[in-house]
Amino acid sequence: MPLSMNREVFITCAVTGAGDTVSKSSHVPVTPKQIAESAIEAAKAGAAVVHCHVRDPETGAPARRLDLYREVTDRIRSADIDVVLNLTAGMGGDLVFGNVESPFPVDEKGTDMAGATERVAHVAECLPEICTLDCGTMNFSLGDYVMTNTPSMLREMARQMTALGVRPEIEAFDTGHLWFAKQLAEEGLIEDPVLIQLCMGIPWGAPDDLNTFMAMVNNVPSNWTFSAFSIGRNAMAYPAAAVLAGGNVRVGLEDNLYVGKGQLATNAQLVEKAVSVVESMGAKIIGPEEVRRKLKLTKR
């Protein structure tokens, strides 16, 4: 994809994620009500898309419960503001080995493995306009945790998402994930317009330096739509990088807790900062209806 600034940008807000962030900021939403309210505030601040995980309301731990997804979905859809709903389908591929000398039995506390149909059950239940598809397996963070997404698993999940009329958002953590996404497209398992999220700076995928970022961008076909984000200290620099490279923007408490040095943020504040950055570059922020037209989404 040639370097060409995007002049019409949509912002995705990743509302809560599944990371161990609840104890680090009181702004991280936990209950379905909190998640939905935070998503709605992000939409009011300028996010056209909200990307939602769910958490156990009692512990804050990541969850896959259908009732939690249904409540979040219903609350967002009944709100007085329009927004494109994007649900994760990344859960159910978590494998934590025992230790380096005895990998089996696996760590039951951290391991959460499910089949393709179970991993997209909440997608079939809630029918969001978009859901994520983590397009590869990789060592994740520290210790012995592997995020597993085998080729056969990804093919079946993509097939089910497409059959449901839900647009997969390919989460690419490295260039090989883009390679496999192209294979899914060639096999007709994902359809045009293809949507990609470039996930930068997440150990141990692609680092978020600009050379690596542009290597990722250059592997995105020119007729595909992409967004990009980084986590941590470079998170609020990435809106500018993504737009300059021709892409769209993702911010949110899933990826970053701070709007400035030492300043814990809400999702709405992160979106407001992204809007300011994008508009200061001379680009236009587009809303949910324009995103639906661009991505050929089915509003629910």
Swiss-Prot record:
<keyword id="KW-0808">Transferase</keyword>
<comment type="function">
    <text>Catalyzes the condensation of dehydrocarnitine and acetyl-CoA, forming acetoacetate and betainyl-CoA (N,N,N-trimethylglycyl-CoA). Is involved in a L-carnitine degradation pathway that allows R.meliloti to grow on L-carnitine as the sole source of carbon and nitrogen.</text>
</comment>
<protein>
    <recommendedName>
        <fullName>3-dehydrocarnitine:acetyl-CoA trimethylamine transferase</fullName>
        <ecNumber>2.3.1.317</ecNumber>
    </recommendedName>
</protein>
<comment type="subunit">
    <text>Homotetramer.</text>
</comment>
<comment type="pathway">
    <text>Amine and polyamine metabolism; carnitine metabolism.</text>
</comment>
<feature type="binding site">
    <location>
        <position position="51"/>
    </location>
    <ligand>
        <name>Zn(2+)</name>
    </ligand>
</feature>
<dbReference type="InterPro" id="IPR013785">
    <property type="entry name" value="Aldolase_TIM"/>
</dbReference>
<keyword id="KW-0479">Metal-binding</keyword>
<comment type="similarity">
    <text>Belongs to the BKACE family.</text>
</comment>
<dbReference type="GO" id="GO:0046872">
    <property type="term" value="F:metal ion binding"/>
</dbReference>
<dbReference type="GO" id="GO:0043720">
    <property type="term" value="F:3-keto-5-aminohexanoate cleavage activity"/>
</dbReference>
<feature type="binding site">
    <location>
        <position position="53"/>
    </location>
    <ligand>
        <name>Zn(2+)</name>
    </ligand>
</feature>
<dbReference type="Pfam" id="PF05853">
    <property type="entry name" value="BKACE"/>
</dbReference>
<dbReference type="InterPro" id="IPR008567">
    <property type="entry name" value="BKACE"/>
</dbReference>
<feature type="binding site">
    <location>
        <position position="254"/>
    </location>
    <ligand>
        <name>Zn(2+)</name>
    </ligand>
</feature>
<keyword id="KW-0862">Zinc</keyword>
